C-alpha cells in the first residue's frame, strides 16, 4: 500500500532525521555557550530554547516520523515522555527555582527576542544548560536505540 514503509526504509528515514536535528540542536547549544560567555543572556536563553526544541524534535521525528508545529517545549517534552519515560526526569519541577528557570526558558522563544523586560540569570542558564546536557545524552540514546533496532 502507498505510505507503508519497510523497517529498513523507516530506519533510513529515522537516521536522516537524527543526523539533521541532532546536529542542529548541538549547533544551537554551541551558540548558546558563545552568547552566554559574552554576557548576552537573553540571546543565550533563546539559543538554549532552540537547542531544547530541536533535541525534542530529533527524538520525535527519529522515533515516530512526526513533529507537531509547536515551539512549546513543555508539550514536546510530554510527547517525548510517551516514547521514553526518562524524558520526565529532564527539567524536573520539584522546587521553585526549577519551575522558574523552566518558565524563563519556555518564554525565551518570544520574549528573549522581543521584550526589553525579559530577564534570566547566569545561575538559571547554568542550571538549564546542565539539563540540556542530560537531554542531549538521552536523545542520542533513545534515537540510536530506535535506529539500531
Language model features: what each stretch is:
Residues 1-149:
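Terminal alpha-helical segments
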Amino acid at each position: 500500500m502507498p505510505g507503508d514503509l519497510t523497517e529498513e526504509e523507516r530506519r533510513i528515514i529515522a537516521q536522516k532525521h537524527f543526523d539533521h536535528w541532532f546536529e542542529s540542536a548541538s549547533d544551537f547549544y554551541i551558540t548558546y555557550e558563545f552568547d552566554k560567555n559574552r554576557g548576552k543572556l537573553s540571546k543565550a536563553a533563546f539559543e538554549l530554547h532552540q537547542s531544547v526544541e530541536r533535541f525534542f524534535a530529533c527524538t520525535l521525528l527519529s522515533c515516530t516520523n512526526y513533529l507537531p508545529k509547536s515551539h512549546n517545549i513543555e508539550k514536546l517534552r510530554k510527547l517525548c515522555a510517551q516514547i521514553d519515560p526518562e524524558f520526565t526526569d529532564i527539567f524536573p519541577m520539584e522546587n521553585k527555582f526549577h519551575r522558574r528557570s523552566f518558565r524563563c526558558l519556555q518564554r525565551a522563544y518570544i520574549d528573549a527576542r522581543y521584550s526589553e523586560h525579559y530577564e534570566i540569570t547566569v545561575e538559571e542558564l547554568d542550571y538549564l544548560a546542565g539539563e540540556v546536557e542530560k537531554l542531549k545524552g538521552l536523545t542520542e540514546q533513545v534515537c540510536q536505540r530506535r535506529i539500531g533496532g
